[in-house]
């Protein structure tokens, strides 16, 4: 699995403020890990977020092209056969310490959040 790492931090894609989480609404957690760590998709989301004031927004066709190119998929109209991508429109990137344990959880309203604080006995 490829990851975007800068300054010993790993970029993780998730979808806060969304009724259908990018990670939590996909049943195949192993397959979705390729997506939430994919450097090219994360770079695209970071670029869109940086330029939102200029009217940039997530383009599903661009996302599909990224997935096709880098995950060697051949996705067309049947994107839901591979990933449930409703959460991609509100996707954000969180930088976590490399090797740190984390979990993506979801609120009752479907908003994802990243848990990094774990209790240890």
Go through the PLM ranges and name each one.
Residues 2-121:
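Catalytic phosphate/metal-binding cores of nucleic-acid and nucleotide-processing enzymes, i.e., regions
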């Amino acid at each position: 699995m490829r990851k975007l790492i800068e300054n010993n931090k790993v970029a993780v894609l998730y979808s806060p403020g969304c009724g259908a989480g990018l990670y939590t609404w996909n049943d195949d957690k192993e397959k979705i890990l390729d997506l939430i760590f994919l450097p090219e998709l994360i770079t695209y989301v970071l670029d869109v977020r940086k330029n939102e004031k200029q009217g940039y927004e997530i383009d599903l066709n661009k996302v599909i092209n990224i997935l096709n190119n880098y995950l060697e998929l051949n996705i067309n109209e049947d994107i839901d056969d591979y990933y449930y991508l409703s959460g991609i429109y509100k996707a954000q990137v969180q930088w976590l310490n490399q090797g740190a344990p984390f979990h993506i959880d979801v609120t009752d309203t479907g908003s994802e959040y990243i848990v990094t604080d774990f209790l240890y006995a």
